[in-house]
Regions:
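Catalytic histidine-centered segment of alpha/beta-hydrolase-like enzymes
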Residues: 198-212
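Gly/Ala-rich beta-loop-alpha elbow adjacent to hydrolase catalytic centers
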Residues: 71-76, 80
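Hydrolase active-site cap/lid region
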Residues: 86-145
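Alpha/beta-hydrolase active-site loop
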Residues: 42-63
């Protein structure tokens, strides 16, 4: 789920996965209001929260799972991308589905700062605070956030997992430009499904049928199953 949401957000995907024969595990992560807080009680934009995704995979493995498909909304997408590039369990991830994801935090923060008319020098100073250990006295974070490590447009070449990426061009909170850039850089592994008119993480609300069909078709291809033809 995304920042500010909880594990109810992914409920909309459970029927699609169930129909495809997949079990679902809806997780919470630190500081989301359900899971225990971190020591500083601050979001790290995915730079640490991915460890909770890793813990959930271990939980699933202990109960019989052998492979995993990750799905993440918004910041949850950033967690999934960190997991597949940093965890020793990444080899068990068969695929990733991203709905309105943050694939580059600098791009998103720049956009939001622009909406708020925050001057460029102040933005730069804020990024330096977030990314440095000494900035913790101002940010309240217990550790620096590595914003470069969260940029998967720059790190596109490092990705190796089949990915379904869905984003709306009408998303005014996390613009689709980053997702489009990633898809353009990695057409070998990224299947990009654009939407128009949907707000942030509202693809299902806007066109649930198309959203569900995109996931079903992609999972069928991943599983090597011929999907049923649409009526």
């Amino acid at each position: 789920h995304g920042r500010g949401a909880d594990r109810r957000e992914p409920l909309r995907a459970v029927p699609v996965f169930h129909e495809a024969g997949h079990s679902s595990l809806l997780i919470s992560y630190r500081n989301d209001g359900v899971a225990p807080n971190s020591k500083d009680g601050r979001y790290a934009l995915g730079d640490t929260e991915w460890e909770d995704v890793e813990a959930s995979i271990r939980f699933a493995l202990a109960r019989g799972a052998t492979q995993v498909v990750l799905m993440g909304w918004s910041m949850g997408g950033a967690l999934a991308l960190q997991l597949i590039t940093r965890s020793p369990l990444a080899e068990l991830v068969r695929g990733v589905i991203l709905d309105s994801p943050v694939v580059d935090w600098i791009r998103v923060l720049d956009h939001q700062a622009g909406v708020l008319r925050i001057p460029g020098p102040i933005r730069t100073a804020a990024y330096q605070l977030i990314g440095s250990g000494w900035g913790s006295r101002f940010t309240g974070q217990s550790a620096a956030i590595n914003l470069a490590r969260l940029d998967f447009v720059a790190r596109a070449a490092e990705l190796a997992v089949p990915t379904l990426l869905m984003h709306s061009d009408a998303d005014t909170f996390v613009p689709s430009a980053g997702s489009r850039a990633l898809a353009d850089l990695r057409p070998d592994i990224v299947t990009y499904v654009p939407f128009a008119g949907a707000g942030h993480t509202r693809l299902w609300n806007y066109d649930g049928k198309r959203w569900g069909q995109a996931i079903s078709s992609w999972i069928s291809e991943l599983d090597g199953v011929t999907p049923p033809s649409s009526p």
